[in-house]
């Protein structure tokens, strides 16, 4: 339940796959609003990316517990066998959003207290983390893949770091584009989408690398060797046939 059949190598594979191969922003284009709005300066993009990664990691872990112990059909059986037939799955999305919104509010209070400059730089986009579809999408992706708890934590961390990496790279490029001779009709949104598309194509080059699946069975060649090997002769060579 907590680790399942996943090894440490599989956990590393899940992290790399969520960060690079299946980057939640560049492969599914979730969270594009804040990605485009808060990437004009590298410092602001870095702060927002760090916040999204933190919120996604913690809320992904909490929502996994919500799914398996509250909203999943039969999840309440751990409280009492009489509650095994209760199905609260219709409340799942609402509870996921409530958890994300609550933790976002906590993060907003902490940033206002300890990082006033970042709090002012993010502005209205900080409370909008609560409705950032990348966070809810990362949670739902992990739940639908039936990850155990630790792989879910690693997947949430990788998805958050992938979004963070994408917005930091994009902010770096946008700072360079500010001093470039971009055609007038492509300035602003046009060159931003072109740049994002080229970044997505670059990350697609890693497609095919997959070490995230658990190995629950022996390799095929081991099975073939076991089945093709000659069976030992159980009859003694000195045994004579019986007379009819």
From Swiss-Prot:
Superkingdom of the organism of origin: Bacteria
Transmembrane regions listed in the UniProt entry: 11-31, 50-70, 90-110, 123-143, 153-173, 191-211
Subcellular localization, as worded in the UniProt entry: Cell inner membrane
GO cellular component labels: Gram-negative-bacterium-type cell wall; plasma membrane
Primary location: membrane
Location of region: Disordered: 222-244
Top-tier EC class: translocase
Any one GO MF annotation of this record: oxidoreductase activity, acting on NAD(P)H, quinone or similar compound as acceptor
InterPro entries, sorted: NqrDE/RnfAE, NqrDE/RnfAE_oxidrdctase, NqrE
Sorted UniProt keywords: Cell inner membrane, Cell membrane, Ion transport, Membrane, NAD, Sodium, Sodium transport, Translocase, Transmembrane, Transmembrane helix, Transport, Ubiquinone
Reactions catalysed, as given in the entry: a ubiquinone + n Na(+)(in) + NADH + H(+) = a ubiquinol + n Na(+)(out) + NAD(+)
Coiled-coil intervals: none
Record EC number: 7.2.1.1
GO biological process: respiratory electron transport chain; sodium ion transport
Compositionally biased intervals (Polar residues): 222-236
Protein topology in the membrane: Multi-pass membrane protein
PANTHER family with a match to the protein in the record: INTEGRAL MEMBRANE PROTEIN OF SOXR-REDUCING COMPLEX (PTHR30335), NA(+)-TRANSLOCATING NADH-QUINONE REDUCTASE SUBUNIT E (PTHR30335:SF1)
Quaternary structure (record): Composed of six subunits; NqrA, NqrB, NqrC, NqrD, NqrE and NqrF.
Stated family: Belongs to the NqrDE/RnfAE family.
NCBIfam families: nqrE, PRK01061.1
Protein role: NQR complex catalyzes the reduction of ubiquinone-1 to ubiquinol by two successive reactions, coupled with the transport of Na(+) ions from the cytoplasm to the periplasm. NqrA to NqrE are probably involved in the second step, the conversion of ubisemiquinone to ubiquinol.
Name the record gives this protein: Na(+)-translocating NADH-quinone reductase subunit E
Organism per entry: Chlamydia trachomatis serovar D (strain ATCC VR-885 / DSM 19411 / UW-3/Cx)
Lineage of the species this protein comes from: Bacteria, Pseudomonadati, Chlamydiota, Chlamydiia, Chlamydiales
Gene this chain is encoded by: nqrE
